[in-house]
Amino acid sequence: ALRETVRISDQVQVMTELAVRNLSSGKWDPGPIEGREAKTDRLTREVVDYLAELRRRTHEQNDATEHLMLVATELENMGDQVRRLYRREQRLKKEGIEFSEQGRAELVATAELVQERMRLAFTALATGDLQMARQVIDGRKPLEEHVARMRLAHLARLEERLLESRASS
């Protein structure tokens, strides 16, 4: 189950890399993202079903299986977020609206920070490196602070009445 969960993380990692690249350019190719998202959904279902069956058969409610189930479903949610970002930008484009230059740059910078943190987390998961896992946990607060600053910057653009900022809220 751990190996399959790592495979899920590999799919999500590539989806995130594609999203950062596409977000940066404003040009999306949905094919690779949708294909990986479908694979992520299938793998997640298989991992969760396997672990649930294992827990039923052994009547064992151990932390390791519970954590793997949570990790797998969170990874699936991350993949869903990439798809939502793509669909959001496509919807805006149909309305003739693009992210503001500053907003796009902030989204890309934030996505790159998240991506780097994901790499660290996925490596910690795959290797069982506790020190690396601690780095991931310790990096949570700085990332949350960065996201809070980006939200405030977005609100400032809303106050400036930028059409792109209002439409992308």
List the predicted regions and their residue ranges.
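Cytosolic, long alpha-helical scaffolding segments
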Residues: 1-169
